[in-house]
Amino acid sequence: MAGMKHTAIAAVIFALVAIAAVSGQQPLFKRTMLQQQDISAPGREAVMALGEFQPGGGPGPHTHPGEEISYVIEGSIVLEQAGKPNVAVKAGESFIIPAGVVHNATNRGTGVAKIVATYVVEKGKPLATPVTGR
């Protein structure tokens, strides 16, 4: 009985260590909010964010409740927009995504890619809504 108890305790400790190790991994995409503020357009707000893409990373297909205006500051990404061909966007280049358009961006390079994004969106709505089953 004592042996089973020690085995169970060891299994729990192992599981907790494994979870801690996995949660310590760097995410493939990270969005850090830089600023969020009301603007003069009624019911709208501006949000600025830093997007960091590890190699192979991206947010997955999603939409925004307003326009996205982004500038690549490091590396390059491949931009995928519904109804348009994929486009490589590199450091020093920018792009605009219209409101509600399904899109994704992926870092297909070997180094980190970073963008600064400004969103002019409907206040009180989620900044990004994932799209599944595409």
Stretches with model-predicted labels:
Residues 40-44, 56-71:
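A short beta-loop-beta micro-motif enriched in histidine and acidic residues
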Residues 2-50, 88, 96, 126-134:
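A short, N-terminal "cap"/entry segment at the start of jelly-roll beta-barrel domains
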Residues 59-64, 81, 88, 106-108:
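Short histidine-centered beta-strand/loop micro-motifs
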Residues 65-83, 93:
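Glycine- and acidic-residue-biased ligand/ion/polar-headgroup-sensing regions
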Residues 51, 57, 73-76, 81, ...:
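Sec/Tat-exported extracytoplasmic proteins
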Residues 86, 100-126:
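Ligand-binding loop in jelly-roll beta-barrel domains
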Residues 58-60, 78, 95-106:
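Histidine-centered metal-chelating micro-motifs
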Residues 53-54, 83-100:
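Short acidic-glycine-tyrosine-enriched beta hairpin
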